[in-house]
């Protein structure tokens, strides 16, 4: 996105004529943003000023046709006021949200967020959802699935706002938080009241929010099922009137086996209105057999047929074309040393990176080890309290930490544009998990690299991954860098070994990553 024009640069473009009025010569710095007000849905005057109240470019005089074209192009790239953003969105070409019958206030809101053109999944799903059809949408990571279901929900809610209009279920707390924040941002021009219901926070405060009849509930299935079972009828009565239900990352929500969320999902869906009384939307990056089976379900009487679309879900399209997939062969005993060297090379030393492990134990140990070796690192895994998970993720988003060590709780849905490197410290057991992990980089057309540390026992796993993604991994190369030689050079192995032993001692002594003794609460008898 091009930088915003400054008031000084704008003033230089203004053509000064001898008969200019006093109003036209007024300093642009003295202009004030319009007051917030709410009018009809179709009126462009109902939009408030953006946080940086620079003047509208519409006051600039036309010098020539070429100058006007340049100014118009800059205006399209740099929306200043929400009213201007609305005009940009409505005057765009056919490949726009306007062409999808999206409400003007939503077009303006999306434009202020620099979302001007719909992606393939958005073009396919938004019109059909607005028609009232149930939907199954499959598209690779980073393709804009959240907006594909958020925009229709907000538009249909605005037509008849009442109680709890929609419930969005998602498998992880971090993804739920991200969806919650995105809905708040898109619905900023309206009086939308979303609520976040996830584990790790006080149930009593959540029960009060649920009883307050919010408009949209974003939840993890386990915590919402807890409220349905224990919080009382009055608290969850509003869920009985829900009109739209979304299962985001549906493949994970519906997968059977150990650790399955399916029982909690069934508890939630059985309490909500039946399929004939609600609109159900499923979105996923990997269409599993469980999700595909829903296509052949009998049509609900009185409802239009289910709309099913698969965009970029074939093997060759499961990872972005701008992603470079590489591997490094490592001995089992020196895996930590290779990771340390990889993160410290000339091309990677400044990159924002996510390092994935298979277990929380590995993530905890690796964070301590990398911190001891001088890396700015934080972690994200299920053993951490929710408040710490939120703060660690916020630190990583703000670049206060350069490296995030995480389990697969961070592999789904999280959109952190600054991430340009993903490292699989341990090869995932499921090829679909690899797809979700590497999808944290190279998002929305950006470039990125995924490096997998491969041991002698991981060959079959790598072959399965290559078959899943439809491409071969190439050996990691960096000009002037020999990872193996750097690992063997000097006392690096001793330093890494000492850091690992120190980290293991901290864990055994019950200390946190900063070396502080954890205070365990004693049970009251």
Curated annotation (Swiss-Prot):
Biased composition (Polar residues): 1-29
Protein name: ATP-dependent RNA helicase dbp8
Disulfide bonds: none
Comment on protein domains: The Q motif is unique to and characteristic of the DEAD box family of RNA helicases and controls ATP binding and hydrolysis.
Protein location: Nucleus, Nucleolus
Source taxon at top rank: Eukaryota
Function in brief: ATP-binding RNA helicase involved in 40S ribosomal subunit biogenesis and is required for the normal formation of 18S rRNAs through pre-rRNA processing at A0, A1 and A2 sites. Required for vegetative growth.
């Amino acid at each position: 996105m091009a930088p915003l024009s400054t008031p000084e640069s704008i003033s230089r473009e203004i053509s000064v004529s001898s008969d200019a009025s006093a109003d036209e010569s007024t300093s642009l710095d003295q202009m004030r943003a319009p007051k917030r007000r709410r009018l009809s849905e179709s009126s462009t005057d109902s939009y408030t000023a953006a946080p940086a109240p620079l003047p509208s470019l519409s006051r600039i005089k036309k010098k020539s046709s070429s100058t006007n074209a340049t100014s118009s192009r800059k205006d399209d790239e740099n929306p200043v006021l929400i009213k201007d953003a609305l005009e940009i969105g409505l005057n765009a070409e056919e490949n726009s949200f306007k062409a999808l019958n999206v409400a003007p206030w939503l077009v303006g809101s999306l434009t202020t967020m620099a979302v001007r053109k719909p992606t393939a999944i958005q073009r396919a799903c938004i019109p059909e959802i607005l028609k009232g059809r149930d939907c199954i949408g499959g598209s690779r990571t980073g393709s804009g699935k959240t907006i594909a279901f958020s925009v229709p929900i907000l538009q249909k809610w605005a037509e008849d706002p009442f109680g709890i209009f929609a419930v969005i279920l998602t498998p992880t707390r971090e993804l739920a938080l991200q969806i919650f924040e995105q809905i708040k941002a898109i619905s900023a021009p309206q009086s939308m009241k979303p609520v976040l219901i996830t584990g790790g926070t006080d149930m009593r405060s959540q029960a009060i929010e649920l009883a307050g009849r919010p408009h949209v509930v974003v939840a993890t299935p386990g915590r919402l099922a807890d409220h349905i079972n224990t919080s009382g009828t009055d608290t969850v009565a509003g869920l009985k009137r829900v009109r739209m239900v979304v299962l985001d990352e549906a493949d994970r929500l519906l997968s059977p086996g150990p650790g399955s969320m399916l029982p909690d999902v069934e508890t939630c869906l059985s309490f909500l209105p039946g399929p004939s009384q609600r609109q159900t939307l499923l979105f996923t990056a990997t269409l599993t057999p469980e999700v595909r089976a829903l296509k052949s379900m009998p049509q609900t009487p009185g409802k239009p047929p289910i709309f099913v679309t698969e965009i970029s879900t074939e093997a060759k399209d499961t990872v972005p074309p701008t992603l470079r997939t590489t591997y490094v062969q490592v001995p089992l005993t020196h895996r930590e040393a290779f990771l340390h060297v990889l993160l410290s090379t000339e091309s990677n030393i400044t990159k924002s990176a996510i390092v994935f492990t298979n277990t929380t134990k590995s993530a905890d140990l690796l964070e301590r080890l990398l911190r001891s070796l001088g890396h700015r690192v934080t972690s994200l895994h299920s053993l951490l309290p929710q408040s710490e998970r939120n703060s660690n993720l916020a630190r990583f988003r703000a670049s206060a930490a350069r490296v995030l060590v995480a389990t697969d709780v961070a592999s789904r849905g999280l959109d952190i544009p600054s991430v340009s490197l993903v490292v699989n410290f341990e090869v995932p057991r499921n090829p679909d998990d690899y797809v979700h992990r590497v999808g944290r980089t190279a998002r929305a057309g950006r470039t990125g690299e995924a490096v997998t540390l491969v041991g002698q026992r991981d060959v079959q796993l790598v072959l399965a991954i290559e078959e899943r993604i439809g491409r071969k991994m190439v050996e990691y190369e960096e000009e002037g860098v020999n990872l193996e030689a750097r690992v063997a050079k000097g006392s690096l192995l001793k330093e890494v070994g000492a850091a690992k032993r120190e980290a293991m001692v901290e864990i055994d002594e019950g200390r946190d990553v900063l070396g502080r003794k954890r205070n365990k609460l004693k049970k009251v008898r």
